[in-house]
Amino acid sequence: MKISLISATSENGVIGNGPDIPWSAKGEQLLFKALTYNQWLLVGRKTFDSMGVLPNRKYAVVSRKGISSSNENVLVFPSIEIALQELSKITDHLYVSGGGQIYNSLIEKADIIHLSTVHVEVEGDINFPKIPENFNLVFEQFFLSNINYTYQIWKKG
């Protein structure tokens, strides 16, 4: 199963401040929507609570608290390991979309990283991990917006 991390970060590495994303760059979330349409998303419980269920996506939520969901597009797992094991039986591609602990746990297992850097420095308590040295930048595009951002694709190799 191919694992892709997808995130937006500030120039100083912040991805969140509690449950909030501390910026709103017009157009940046369209990249997320386009890439994750009809895909499986692996998220932690706090990220899932803050983002809710987006249409045309399936969710694997990791929660040690044993939450449940009646939504047919949401599966809950007690650990990342069990989630990966079970998801490998039903999909060949998984998008990891947060939060910080999930990114830190899976960045070494990722095959691809989709990263938007929003050109602003903000305060926050959740940071994206350092991209490992065995990843190579294979694509980069700058976007003009109310807050400019750069979208990058990194591949393990």
Swiss-Prot record:
Pfam families xref list: DHFR_1
Disulfide bonds: none
Annotated keywords: Antibiotic resistance, Methotrexate resistance, NADP, One-carbon metabolism, Oxidoreductase, Plasmid, Transposable element, Trimethoprim resistance
Cellular component GO terms, alphabetical: cytosol
Single Gene Ontology BP annotation: response to antibiotic
UniProt keyword annotation of Metal-binding present: no
PROSITE patterns: DHFR_1 (PS00075), DHFR_2 (PS51330)
Ranges in coiled-coil conformation: none
SUPFAM superfamilies on file: Dihydrofolate reductase-like (SSF53597)
One MF annotation (Gene Ontology) recorded for this entry: NADP binding
Domain named DHFR: residues: 2-156
Recorded superkingdom: Bacteria
Transmembrane segments: none
Reactions listed under catalytic activity: (6S)-5,6,7,8-tetrahydrofolate + NADP(+) = 7,8-dihydrofolate + NADPH + H(+)
Pathways involved: Cofactor biosynthesis; tetrahydrofolate biosynthesis; 5,6,7,8-tetrahydrofolate from 7,8-dihydrofolate: step 1/1
E.C. designation(s): 1.5.1.3
Oligomeric and partner information: Homodimer.
Biological role stated in the UniProt entry: Key enzyme in folate metabolism. Catalyzes an essential reaction for de novo glycine and purine synthesis, and for DNA precursor synthesis.
Record-stated family: Belongs to the dihydrofolate reductase family.
Protein name per the record: Dihydrofolate reductase type 7
Organism, as annotated: Escherichia coli
Higher taxonomy: Bacteria, Pseudomonadati, Pseudomonadota, Gammaproteobacteria, Enterobacterales
Gene name tied to this protein: dhfrVII
